[in-house]
Amino acid sequence: MKLFPRTLLKILVVSFILNFGVTSKSYADDTLDTIVNTLQNLTCETQGVGDLLRTEFSQTCIVAPFFTFAIMNLVSPVLYMNTFLKLRINDNELFGTQFPGGQCTRENRADPNDLKLTFGLCSNLKLAGVRAKAVVDSALAIAKAVLTGNDPWDDIKEAWKNNKADYYNIYTQKPEDSGTMWDLGVPIFWKVVQDNDRICVGTYGFTGVVPVGCKYIKEPFPKSMYNSFMDVNDTNFIDDPNNKAVDPLALVSCSAAGGGCYQKAYNASRTAVVMTSPLIECIRQMIARLLISEDVCSFDDVNAVVNSASRQTSALFQFQVGMYRIVTAFLTLYVMLFGAKILLAGQVPPKNEYINFILKIIFVTYFSIGLNITPGSTSPYDRMDGMIQWAFPFLLNGINGLASWVMNAAPSGLCKFNGPDISYDNSVAYIALWDALDCRVAHYLGLDMLSTLLVENTYKSHNFANFDFFSFSAPPYIYLLIPAIISGNMMLVSLALAYPLLVISVAAFMVNATVMCMVSIVILGILAPLFVPMFLFDYTRGYFDSWVKLMISFLLQPMVVVTFMITMFSVYDFGFYGKCQYQSKLIHNSIEGALQGQTFKRDVLVFFVDNDWTKYSKEDAESCQNSLGYMLNNPISTAFNFAKDSVEQIVGSKPNQTCDPKAADADTKCNPKPGDSSTSSFLSKFQFLSGVILGPGMFFVSPKLLFEKIKDILLALVTACFTLYLMYNFSSQLANFAADMTEGVALSSVAIKPQAVFKAAMAALAAAGNATKGLDQFATKGGGGGDLLSTKGGRAGDLVKGSGGGGGSEGGDSFTSGGLRETSSTAATPSSALSSVGKSVGGTATPSSASEEMLDTSFSNRKPIEAPVSQPTTVSTQIDTAIKTEPPKVSAAEVVRNTAEDKLEDLSSKLNVTKEIKEAVPESQKEEPKEPRVKHTTEVEPELNLDENLGVTRTIRGLDKDRKFTEQESHELKIGEAGYVKQEMRNAQIRDRRAAFEKETEELYRSVGGRAKDKATERNDGTIENRSKKIDSGSDENP
């Protein structure tokens, strides 16, 4: 058993080599399919991934979004993924015989009377045995070929033929059946469960059984969850004893067979990248359910609900029933007034008035409450109105019909979905408009690059022999975006993304405007029983006219928006692609592959530039080849044409020589020779070089050809930029322009503006650019706080020393006074680190542990400072008499760092300036009150004597314990209310105190940072003494 994994690995390697060798067979129809098959057949897991890529959702009949797949993996980790990749339900090769046409078709749904589910689980163990047998058969075929000399490839192909039934375990189980399949030691748990009208096979998770693959149960079961009145016990819908329902709603387009609005639109779409059509289809189905019945999803099914109670769920029907008596009263009043008019006139009115009278009554009745279509019936369900039968279908289909005429009128042939080779079902014909929009957006954003690459290279010759990786429709902005991202230049990024963002913004506005117009038409249509009767009287006729005008405006506004978009796209096409024409290729069985048992095929129309120059005139071909878009999208072809043109210009015919390529004579045939073409004749083609004077030493001819390419590129760029500028400015007024043209309401207030996405993206890019610029500036300064400090005053230690807080460049917390030094701990208190004036007495060091000191110690041993710095402006202060708590400790290095980083709040919170005095001042010191207060030495700058400066701000009103201003203004009372004047006076006082605090803090910060200038050099000792007295007395006057 130890050798089993190694043997299995060898078998897999051999199978891969042999499978890859089969691809060299000449009769391989498609190399890509063969490679995918080779990779797919290695293990059960790779087969599961391959089936997802080629045949969507082969493990289930009910399509689920990718979000469900992600959530299930979280609910059932490992188990769900293993079961998901090995499970097969929608597989014709396994179940085609038992279920003709596919297990997922409507005919092959689960029978409610005999409820069972058939599914298969892939076994790697059986697959390894099948591969081993294939290896043996291949070896025998090779040996036979050696002996007989025949070709062994047919036998090898037959040996490796993929027969899924050989390595799949097939199960047919009913609900609540469960089991375990062991695959190479890994258990695969499964259980069959019933979920409403579905039968599923699942695995175990944290929440119980997690469904993995499901299929529907046949209708009706036992009461339809889609049509509430469809019941097998209702004999009105049964015509035979087999309980076969004949309900007309059983086969409507939005029944269970349709797969929902998203799937219906996706299946009907003909573009490679589907974006907008599912949204529009879902909106249309919602409107149909709202206006007709919840059981239908299209106006084509309106006849299915005639004389049916399901109309009760219609909002329009309910409003019509409620307005029935009011409309009848309006009609009665109109008849009475018309009769009174005839009686008062005294003569018979003309016949046209009788005709207008009758037509008005019929019009109002038909479009407001409906006409009875069943003679003798009084049921409101028998009434059919003109809004449902005529107005809504005309308006809603007209929105898309008028716009599609403009959208498909592309001169270049790009994204035209109304050609003879493509057709839509009548119920989804409107999707041609949204396919054209999706195709345009995908083409300009480069979302269709991969599909165009494969189609253009493979479907021409059905192989990769002439594969050109560089020939795909990459939008030109990609070539600007790549260097912009690499260089980090946000200006290039903005320039590169300007046009795609504008395309996205205008496209989003078109979709939003169309949806808003459809919803607005629905709202106005529901109110038809209220506005239509106003048509009867001249006094209320204006309301009816406004109602009709709004309906028509909402019908035409999307067409105006589409006209603008197609104009913008056409100018863009001409600016970037010149006169290039696009060719389309209809792909059958496209990337999605066969869905639901190979019974459905989605055709995709892919567009690419037609490079068959025989279809162009000479002028159009040159315009296309010299366009910026063609050169960027086809670099190999452009380089080849450039080299060919250069050779033709260098190796040209002689001037004034008549050439005939078909002539037999070599001289007449004009075989090109080097140097025969003159420089003058070459330069004559370029008008912008007409002023060049030829002379000896002119440059070679071939580089001169670059002028033409550069000229074409610059002209294309200028045209594109000018187009972008015009369209950007015009798009800002697009909503108002459309409203003015149709005399309606502008949608700019209720819909996304045409420039919304563009402006938001540009603002994000600008913010990113500012952030990048800030990082660059920070990096240029060294990226560290030391450099920042150096630029603002030298080294950290020098700044501390110069401020009185450090003893050298090392930043140590030592302080010098008269040749004696006091050494404190690393985290010195503010009094020891910043106020050494009050701690050195008589040249003796004061212990740092002392907690009770005099605020003003002896001044006899201190000499006056020669150039004191001006003190900050004082605010209202108050000095207490006792020290209640020891001030928090702070190091000088922290003070410097906070100063350099402009952190005023941290500084004010760390420097506790509350200093109180417990002991009385000694008598010896009281005898000399006139002696001025001085600093240590001239080495200590007076600007950091913060005992005085910070003492000024310690009792400002509104400060909390962290020294932050917390007082807030109150604006609860309004003008005229009691207490309003007192409130405003208090607010003014708070503003004054806040301003004083901010001013004092700023001056204190400048003093600590050493940036305040020396403005007090003229002050004498008396000024300092007066300053001390004012502080001691609590005065709030400024010195």
Curated annotation (Swiss-Prot):
| Topological category with respect to the lipid bilayer | Multi-pass membrane protein
Q: Where is the composition biased (Polar residues)?
A: 843-861
Signal sequence interval, chain numbering: 1-28
Q: Name one GO cellular component term.
A: plasma membrane
**One Pfam family name from the record?**
TrbL
Biological process terms from the Gene Ontology for this record are: protein secretion by the type IV secretion system
The family this protein is said to belong to: Belongs to the TrbL/VirB6 family.
What's the protein here called?
A: Uncharacterized protein RBE_1265
Task: Report the source organism.
Answer: Rickettsia bellii (strain RML369-C)
